[in-house]
Amino acid sequence: KDFILKGYNLDKGSSHFKLGPLKIISDGSLGARTAYMRNFYEDDKTTKGISIYNKEILQELISTAHDNNMSVAVHAIGDGAIEMAMNCIEVAIKNNPKKDTRHGIVHCQITDEMLLNRFKKLDLIAYIQPIFIHYDQHILEDRVGKELAKTSYNWKTLIDLGVVVCGSSDCPVESFDLMNNLYCAVTRKDLNGYPEEGYNKSQCLSIEEALKCFTIGGAYASFEENLKGTLEVGKFADMVVLDEDIYRCDKNKIKDININMTIVGGDIKYSL
């Protein structure tokens, strides 16, 4: 709160260093059963996880950011945490209506249909980390049950609803290797190729959709879609050169594609 009230907001920064959105961690993780759930965990009926803040404090944090020209990106994994974050964002917007706030939920893993639809209703950005499929598919149903698992990690549904989906690596918790993320997004398999048909395969993204998450989606989230995210005249020439055509290769081999060159602002910064 002190940080925001000192005037740090979305107007600060440069083309290479930009403030915002404000990260707020509201719960824990699915693996540790600390993601905050509406109901008790299926495999531990003694806990619903951990909510870092009560709703009053979370509301104060989100409203302070909203009122002072700062978007929020709320870490919320469990359905209880996601619902609380959405409720607080909705109140902040209702009390101080603004256009183009670009608030979002980070991870947004455990969802039902109502929560998925609220992403669109509230015009929230969904920050996803496809690499989580590698591990979480093996524990998801045990943690939350089969029914809730069906509507969780539903990235394709979010895209079809018209939600802006922003892909990220979750580095340093996970590797910065984005090829593994793209692989998991389009195959819904772990890095060992399991399951053969993909976990909840109806939620597989096309390679075009996955690439948009990690390019246009990220640019939009930082209010920079007019500067980056696509290769167009007048935009930064930020790009990589791959050793294989990602549009044509076997999708199961995406994780094995190498980066031959990195170009930033039209200048080669790395090459083999």
Feature roles, as predicted:
Residues 1-79, 83, 118-125, 130-131, ...:
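Metal-coordinating catalytic core of metallo-dependent amide/deamination hydrolases
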Residues 16, 254-255:
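Short solvent-exposed loop/turn micro-motifs enriched in small/polar/acidic residues
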Residues 10-11, 250-254:
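Short proline/glycine-enriched turn/loop segments at secondary-structure junctions
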Residues 62-73, 80-103, 107-108, 113-117, ...:
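His/Asp/Glu-enriched, well-ordered alpha-helical/loop segment
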Residues 4-8, 169, 249:
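Short beta-alpha junctions and helix-cap segments that line functional grooves
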